[in-house]
């Protein structure tokens, strides 16, 4: 396989901007955001993702990209959670296994922001989305959410299941 020796993020950015100048499709803006993100230009990436999210190309993935970028920019947690809410809202309902990782990501965000009950709901939705095909770590994380939410019996049940799967 032949690789391009002179290919860089800057070259890719220049090319995608030229393409957007010819035909300003949202897919080019998404790609520009991804390149800027890879270059760690998070402010530029966020601006691109926000344009995509205001277009007909808005998707769970584009809102997720915006949420992760805002998180890296140390934005207020409420803003990041709002973007993750939009991410999950753009998933097919009921959420399928392909989109289930977004639920785990939001559950972790909820846990980091003392919203254990909301985290439990996302863990439960994840469990449903993957038809119960989960591992010991899942049960441990859901147990932690249940414990913080003062759902002690659920917490006990989940930690027992985690230990069963990984003694």
Segments from the language model and where they lie:
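Register position in tetratricopeptide repeats
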Residues: 5, 38, 72-73, 112, ...
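TPR-repeat structural position
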Residues: 9, 42, 76-77, 116, ...
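Start-of-helix register in tetratricopeptide repeats
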Residues: 25-28, 61, 97, 101, ...
